Amino acid sequence: MWKMREFEEKLYKENLYKIAGLDEVGRGCWAGPLVVAICVLKKDYNNKLIKDSKKMSSKNRKLVFEQLNREALLIDWIIYDAEFVDKTNPKKTSIIGMEYLINKHKDKIDYCLIDSEKVENVLVKTQSIIKGDQKSISIASASIVAKVVRDDIMNQLDKKYPLYGFSKNKGYGTKHHIEALAKYGPINKIHRFSYKPIKNLLLNKKE
């Protein structure tokens, strides 16, 4: 048995075939949105390119995203901007997004596999899997969808705000990003002002 399909194979034996994988991307970023995605694959779907999106090249992620668009039974995502993440907190934002997507598509799902998080306000049975994007093809597929969608947004933001290097750092706290923040300050509605590094930067500027 292919390890990336181990959880799915167990569910197939229980006559559960429409298995949704859910994951988020962008939780630890200092800038940009948080994206939550859902993906339902056909039974026994096989694509050896699929793995944890963080371990894939950008080219392969885009290729798999296009394949999933054509071949998956369902893919969908929801985008939460930096303001929402600031008001709600990143963990809760992830859970809200997962619950929304599960309930939106409840009639098309038999069971949900979720990366790390536990959800409660849903009408479908779920299972939380630690490091699920490394263990489940369904979760890994959702991770790829969320990553490609978010990277595209960050590439667009890079065109609007070229001084921050968003196309390269994707909103994470890289050396260049830190230097740009120190020089130009955070961008309203783009940076996450509730995050400690941004808070500290603003405090230092006041002193």
State each model region's role:
Residues 1-207:
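RNase H-like, Mg2+-dependent phosphodiesterase core
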